Amino acid sequence: MQSGNLPLWVKQALDSAPEEIETYIYGEDIDVEIPPAYDTFPKLLLRNSKEIGNKTALREKKHGIWQRITWKDYLENVKKFSLGLIALGFQEDDKITLVGDNRPEWLYAYLAAEAAKGIPFGVYQDNLAEQLLPLIQNSGSRWIYCEDQEQTDKVLSILDELPEVSRIIVKDWTGMWRYRDNPMLISVDKVMELGEELGKKEPGLFEENLNSQSKDDVACFATSSGTTGVPKCVMLSYENMMFMGLALQKVVSMSIEEDYFSFLPLAWIGEQMMVFSCGLTTGFRVNFYEEPETVNNDLREVGPTIMFGPPRIWRDMLAEVQVKIADAGMLKRKIYDMAMKIGYTCVDREFKGQEISAYMKFARQLAYYIVFRPILDKLGLKRIRHAFTGGAQVSVDDFRMLRAMGVNMKQIYGQTEISGISCLHRDGDVDPWTSGKPLPRTVIAITKRGEIISKSPAVMLGYYDRPYEDDVVDGWLYSGDMGMVDAKGHLVVVDRLADVITLQDGTLVSPQHLENRLKFSPYVREAMILDNGRPYVTAILNIHFENVAKWAEDNNIPFTGYMDLSQKTEVYDLLESVVREVNKNLQESMKIRKFISLYKEFDPDDEEMTRTRKLRRGLIRERYREVIEALYTDAEEIDFVGEIKYEDGTRDQVQVRMKIRRVE
């Protein structure tokens, strides 16, 4: 616990703590000021158009060519879109749900709604229609922006249950000629055309709307994590969002010359944090991919300087590296292993705050230019200055590997309810086991029961759809996460309080820690550790189909598909070797004693994961109860009746016999 003379704002925060706290940490005592003249996102856009109007704001790849959008263009498109909404009857406090891929038009719709004194609400584009329904209903949206036919069809299929919806705005009309006569549908181009006409009739309306807003107004709705059910509508003000972006820039250097690659769903608070909270305040370039299938190639072409992604993204990148190195010749593998050894030696000394010798610095530079730089170039990370990971705790192994390869990786901790960030690593003060220190003007405390609570100007206004379910008490946000503070004043996130496992001998086990160690293998896509009150630890594993399939082909193992491959004896042998490797570094009571390779992947469409790829543990335990019970018997296999989903979306029941493997 920090001692001495506390800043007044820290004292006030601690005095308002709703319960006794065990310890606390706080961020830098520096002012984070939101300029009164530019205290909303649309006002920032107007400022950027005036001050850096001819600079590139956005870049989008179309037909293989990067298209440039200046800040003046950006403002003009938002202005026409906003006035077009008003011409169609959009009113103050109206809500608009946004469903689509990362495109400039998504940003236009978001900022246009704000400029019209409304509230945008981004939802994940891979939601099924039945998952979209409660989100749209709970948000009270009267307007919906859809990117294309796929999203439009979803909304039209549930429209009878959405009587409040007045218009659906569609960007891409490819294949939609038969929809032309539907009065509910209107194109983005038509909305902008109406906006241009209204702008000529009322030339001061747009600026008048902007000037009537302030930092206290609701900027957007954002979805909560949704690990326990339907995600909630989190209300965030402009002050919440802008404070977080400006506070981040106090401890992370960002300039107008940065390139950010936007490829994670814009519905995720992390992406909105970068594109709006940081992009608009800093003025850096935001780049969009051409199609989801071209993300990897487009990322390499952009070579971003800033990148933010959840652990799954970084794990997939590293799995690609691991598989390619495994396929390389002996000499290349030897050189790579030597380079990694040098990298690990250096970063481990950095983590401990120890000096690196001149010889090791030279060896590290050599390893970087000969081995790591070409690899990072292939991944699109050669120019990276700041790489952030958040949304979940990244594996220590992945973190060390990325840092060893020369990626300036930093862990972020936060929730949607605190506008995305409350803690992160600082340059020169990084630890793979922690989430760093609080942002400026932010206090983090640990309660007596071990829960992480936070207080800062970025804490949400509340839940729009469930005001009675408030996780904020006297300005303190209750996270539901278990944590502690280490000797360096870093926050250590253990796991979700509800997920921490207590074994029969009283040992506390963090499922997330063990799961991350398992997923460091390129052959394990997902893992779930089981279970509270049981005599020993077991696991349900999902194979990484692409990597295991390649391994099977290289070893002449025939298979017909995921289900068949997952149950091969040879694959179980492969997975057992992974489990044994993880067990080597675990105390006896924490070792994984049994595992099963599930016949299918955990899937957000089956509601087994959230859209940010977090496990819905309660649902999984209920759905696979028979499987879990079998893991705690002497059974060597189990016959299970489950469900599979085909590529065309149809479902079918399937009876599958799954092996249970004991690890001695």
Please tell me what each predicted stretch does.
Residues 438-503, 531:
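Conserved ATP-binding/catalytic segment of the ANL
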Residues 150-213, 321-374:
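ANL superfamily adenylate-forming
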Residues 501, 526-528, 533-535, 551, ...:
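Conserved C-terminal "lid"/linker of ANL adenylate-forming enzymes
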Residues 242-259, 266-373, 383:
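Conserved AMP-binding/adenylation subdomain of ANL enzymes
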